[in-house]
Amino acid sequence: MSTAHVLTTTRRGALGLGAGLTALGGALAVAGPVLAAPTATASTRLDTGVGLGSGAVGTQSVVLDQPAVRQASLDAVRALRRRMWGKNPPLLSLDGASGGTVQSYAAQEGYATVDAYADAVVWDQDLERIAVQRLAECIDMGKIQHSRPNGEASSTATIGDIATGTYEILAMTSDTSAGITTGIDMWAGEYDQLVAEGGAWSHATGHLHTLLNPSVTHYGFAASSGYSVGQGLWSRGGSADSTGWSGTYDITLAGGTDEAPAASVQTDRPAPSGSGSSSGFQHIIRSFWR
């Protein structure tokens, strides 16, 4: 039995975004609001602290285990970077003006060894909060896309000094038991295409590029019900601790539906058969420029 899954990525204004947020990050490092992590035994209402945007406010029930997601995702991304250091595929900056290979690009960013490159990956609680918010919104919509249930762009999911957008990567599989490592494996599946495109960021390489880009070091991930969400940014101030959210939560969102469709029957278009994947997965890859 094959498992359908979907990928989508966005480069938030790519070149213009980079200059704007780098300047902001260099001038001011402000962590997002600190919210107590409730202990959920039954369903607990949760406000992530992320801006909801316009529209009527409702909730979406989501089962979270963010401490486990934090550890698993950090381990997986660091391990991925170590593997890619050894393979040393081409990797360019977003504008193509710098880079070369994983190792040479990492060295340009100040990471001269595999340990330095892999260990540069750190958790960012503000990005985690955005990831959890976007997870709830994707589950509510029954699909992954870089917009929100109220129709606004995902870049409106802001918190603290993260006010312009992030590098957002999304994945969805009909295997609702799949965790964040499945999502990371799906994103890493773009290796051959990254090589074919000479290391450039594109619609078909953006997920893996976001995980390997040595200028992107801060990440937050969330996963539930077959959905995986990643948020990335360059080095910034903020807490490296998990929110600690673990249990069933009714997460607030704007413009949501009364009942979320099942992920197993939701794709953006029919999944092509015979993808050739050794895992038996069928692939749909979608990417967006913002």
Located regions from the model:
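Short, well-ordered surface patches within globular domains
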Residues: 46-159, 208, 214-219, 224
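Composition-driven, intrinsically disordered low-complexity tracts enriched in small residues
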Residues: 36-56, 60, 245-290
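Aromatic-acidic/polar surface patches that form glycan- and anion
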Residues: 7, 66, 70, 200
